[in-house]
Amino acid sequence: MKMIVGLGNPGSKYAKTKHNIGFMVIDQLCEKYNVTLNKHDFEAEYGSFKYEGETVLLVKPLTFMNDSGRSVGPLMSYYQVGIDELLVIQDDMDLTMGKLRLRQKGSAGGHNGIKSIIAHTKSQTFKRLKIGIQHPQKSTVVNWVLTPFDKDGAPVINQAIDQACEESTTGVKMTTL
């Protein structure tokens, strides 16, 4: 079993914000593979589908971003998902808008959602698909990540979401995700 977790904040207030790029990718994967996130426990909403014979869990933690591990850790334990079978989709301010980067392991890099997952899984060796949201020019980090993409950024991000969906499912084909 593989688990793809999209990071974000719950609620309509945050739905289209930069910090919710992980949720946006999960939503598109759900649409593409006809998945309903109909399970609601472990402080998450999630659903599953089969991809080339492999069960894949799509997960949106319902904790706020900075406490995502509180949901991810118990879900992994319950479904016996190994750390090498986890892919986390996150925003990254250090990447230019729409750029994708797959990391096999590493520190949180200042991302509190990743820091929480590391704390709850006791490992840094899970894969992350980072999507660039660019560093704010003038606004504070909090204001930047909690605002929607502007008219110039939206088409770039929509393309990045499409690409992230492809990268996510390509990873599922690999033995170690």
Curated annotation (Swiss-Prot):
UniProt-listed Pfam families: Pept_tRNA_hydro
Keywords linked to the UniProt accession: Cytoplasm, Hydrolase, RNA-binding, tRNA-binding
EC number of this enzyme: 3.1.1.29
Domain of life: Bacteria
InterPro entries documented for this protein: Pept_tRNA_hydro, Pept_tRNA_hydro_CS, Pept_tRNA_hydro_sf
Disulfide bonds: none
Active site: 19 (proton acceptor)
GO annotation, biological process: protein quality control for misfolded or incompletely synthesized proteins; rescue of stalled ribosome
Record GO cellular component, one term: cytoplasm
Site (Discriminates between blocked and unblocked aminoacyl-tRNA): 9
Reaction it catalyzes: an N-acyl-L-alpha-aminoacyl-tRNA + H2O = an N-acyl-L-amino acid + a tRNA + H(+)
Molecular function per GO: peptidyl-tRNA hydrolase activity; tRNA binding
Site (Stabilizes the basic form of H active site to accept a proton): 91
SUPFAM superfamilies named in the record: Peptidyl-tRNA hydrolase-like
Function: Hydrolyzes ribosome-free peptidyl-tRNAs (with 1 or more amino acids incorporated), which drop off the ribosome during protein synthesis, or as a result of ribosome stalling. Catalyzes the release of premature peptidyl moieties from peptidyl-tRNA molecules trapped in stalled 50S ribosomal subunits, and thus maintains levels of free tRNAs and 50S ribosomes.
PANTHER family: PEPTIDYL-TRNA HYDROLASE
Family that this chain belongs to: Belongs to the PTH family.
HAMAP family per record: Pept_tRNA_hydro_bact
Subunit structure: Monomer.
Protein name per its UniProtKB record: Peptidyl-tRNA hydrolase
Taxonomic source organism: Latilactobacillus sakei
Gene from which the chain derives: pth
